[in-house]
Amino acid sequence: MKQVVKTIKRTIFAVALFACISSCTSDDDIDDIFIERGWTLTYIQEGGVRRNTEGKKYSILFGEAAFTATTPDGSTITGEWKADGGTRSFTCYNVRSSSNFQKDTIAKSMLNLLKNARKYEGDTHWLRIKQQENVYMLLGSEK
C-alpha cells in the first residue's frame, strides 16, 4: 500500500512539474511591453558619457507597428519598429524627425539611437533600447 501511495505522489509531482515547466517561457510579451505603452526617457548612455534629461520630458509611444517620440519643444521622431521577444532584438526603420536637433543633444542622441537600435532589455516597468552594450537609452513606463 505504501508503495502505491508513493507511486501516486511521484506521478502527481511529475505531472505538476511538467505543467509548470511547459507553461513557462523565456520569450518576452512584446505586446505588453511595447504596444500602447508610453515611456519617458530617464537618460542616454553613450560609452562613458551619461546624458540626463535634466527634468525635461522626452517620451516615446509605441503603437502596433509605429512609434512617435516627442521632445520638450514639441519636435517629433517617428518611425516603424519591430522586436523579437525570444532574441530581444529591436530595430527601427523609416525613422524621421521634424527637427535636426542642432541645440538639443539629448534629442539628437535619441534620434541616432533609434536609427541604430539593435536590442532591448526590460519589462513593463523599465526599458533599455540598445545600439551596443554601452550605448543605450533607459526609459521608465508611464503606466
Predicted regions and their residues:
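C-terminal motif of bacterial Sec signal peptides marking the signal peptidase cleavage site
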Residues: 20-23
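Lipid interaction determinants
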Residues: 25-78, 82-143
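Short, linear, compositionally biased motifs with a strong N-terminal bias
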Residues: 14-18
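N-terminal hydrophobic targeting signals that begin at the initiator methionine
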Residues: 1-2, 25
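Bacterial N-terminal signal peptides that target proteins for export
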Residues: 2-12
